[in-house]
């Protein structure tokens, strides 16, 4: 008999925390080395041209996140997590062998699908396991593991690029991350949909007919939360795209860029350890206000 709760499902919960660290690791690979990669391999120096890979990633991830809810109900969370990892496998191979910038953009479209499916899967699966009581804590641990891994791999990719060159060794790390994530998911992660059915028996809340319209325009509270999330992700995109370009133009080496690029997601992740649990008993509106 399956039961909701963190203690009752601790082993699966910890496993999903580990899996999400690998999810974060995939996106962290590009946080440091792209300016030099673009300059050396494609003779790109234009900021607007270089940043096209982030635009491709962001749009694809947004669309994948939007579709995730219905896809999860149809195919199951674990299956989507597996599919997300399958999309990750060719990314490092494409980047190693890319001879046109278009291939880099294509690789980041795949990365957007990967992140949309895997990150959404892991956070929802954790929430499924713990139930209503510890949702904030589950979310906090998910973000902690993911963003801490972004920081770690941002530094590691810079270190590898500085020691062995911008390609291929940093991307070998990406391939290893994707492979381990896929193996862990296929053989050890369990589907959490049965836990959703358990919680739905005691949940009398009404379903929303058009979630996009309701959360973006109609419901003022949800609309403001959505806008805050948009601003937060825009900030992240600017740090990801512009900071390494600025540091590269200042003639810092990749390891130095990696240290600076790693600081932001690392401290973001560490902060989630505290703010996640806070949201279970403290006003989320006040937390959002002070955060903004």
Language-model segment annotations:
Residues 64-76, 161, 272-283:
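Helix-to-loop junctions at the C-terminal end of transmembrane segments
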Residues 1-10, 191-227:
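Juxtamembrane intracellular "pre-TM" segments in multi-pass secondary transporters
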Residues 79-93, 286-292:
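Structural signature of the two symmetry-related core transmembrane helices
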Residues 169-187:
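Symmetry-related core transmembrane helices of the 12-TM Major Facilitator Superfamily/SLC fold
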Residues 109-147:
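Cytoplasmic helix-loop-helix junction between adjacent transmembrane helices
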Residues 57-66, 150-151, 265-273:
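Residue-level signature of mid-helix packing/kink "hotspots" within the transmembrane helices
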Residues 149-161, 244:
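Small-residue (Gly/Pro/Ala) motifs that create kinks and tight helix-helix packing interfaces
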Residues 6-58, 221-228, 232-250:
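Helix-loop boundary and gating motifs at the non-cytosolic
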């Amino acid at each position: 008999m399956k039961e909701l709760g963190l203690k009752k499902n601790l082993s699966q919960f910890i496993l999903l925390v580990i899996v999400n660290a690998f999810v974060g690791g995939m996106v962290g690979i590009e946080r440091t080395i792209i300016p030099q990669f673009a300059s050396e391999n494609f003779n790109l120096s234009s900021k607007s041209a270089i940043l096209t890979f982030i635009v491709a990633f962001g749009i694809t991830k947004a669309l994948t996140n939007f579709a995730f809810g219905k896809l999860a109900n149809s195919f199951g969370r674990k299956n989507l997590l597996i599919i997300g990892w399958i999309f990750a496998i060719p990314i490092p191979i494409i980047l190693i062998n890319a001879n046109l910038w278009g291939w880099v953009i294509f690789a980041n479209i795949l990365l957007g699908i990967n992140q949309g499916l895997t990150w959404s899967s892991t956070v929802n699966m954790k929430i499924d396991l713990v139930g209503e009581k510890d949702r904030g804590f589950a979310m906090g641990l998910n973000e902690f593991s993911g963003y801490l891994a972004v920081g770690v791999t941002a530094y590691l990719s810079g270190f590898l690029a500085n020691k062995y060159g911008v390609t291929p060794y940093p991307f070998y790390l990406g391939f290893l991350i994707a492979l381990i994530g896929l193996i862990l998911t296929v053989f050890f992660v369990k589907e959490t949909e049965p836990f959703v059915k358990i919680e739905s028996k005691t949940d009398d809340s009404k379903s929303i007919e058009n979630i996009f319209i309701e959360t973006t325009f109609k419901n003022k509270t949800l609309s403001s939360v959505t806008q805050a999330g948009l601003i937060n992700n825009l900030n992240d995109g600017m740090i990801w795209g512009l900071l390494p370009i600025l540091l590269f133009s200042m003639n810092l080496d990749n390891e130095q860029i990696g240290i600076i690029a790693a600081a932001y997601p690392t401290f973001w992740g560490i902060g989630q350890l505290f703010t996640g649990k806070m949201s279970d008993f403290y006003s989320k509106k006040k937390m959002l206000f002070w955060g903004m």
